[in-house]
Amino acid sequence: MTICCKDKQCSLSKIEHFHDVVGHCLAPHERLYADTILTLSSFGQIAEKQLLELEIRYDYVKIDKYVIMPNHIHAIIILEGAAGASPRPTLTDIICTYKSLTTRECNAVNKTMGRKLFQTSFYDHVITNEVEYQNVWQYINENPRKWGNDEYYI
């Protein structure tokens, strides 16, 4: 699943590449990807918190892998349980709620109202086998290191 910021605004994190990260102490809002440090902004920290809270809000949701890039979020979201067992929120419902809660909290922190943080739609893809799962997992894992070549890079 991929969610993009409105107008591709880089408001969630920043990415820096280093030749040598040995000895660099990471802050709680920083993530290390080989020679790359991803630093979450205050909005990115809210986006991460809300993403992880989806597992609490919906007992059948598992956030398996994710990355919060400067202007988009990638995640592997697993919807557990038997398909069609009972009516429950769909992935679209879950993402809509996620975007709404994240935007509302970011606007409260920024003391603005009505500002849109995300694009209206999102991209999803059903992973159908282990090879595809490994490819998507690896893509998410390597995305910060390849930021300069990313299709969402501006």
What are these model-predicted stretches?
Residues 2-154:
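Short catalytic/metal-binding and nucleic-acid-binding patches
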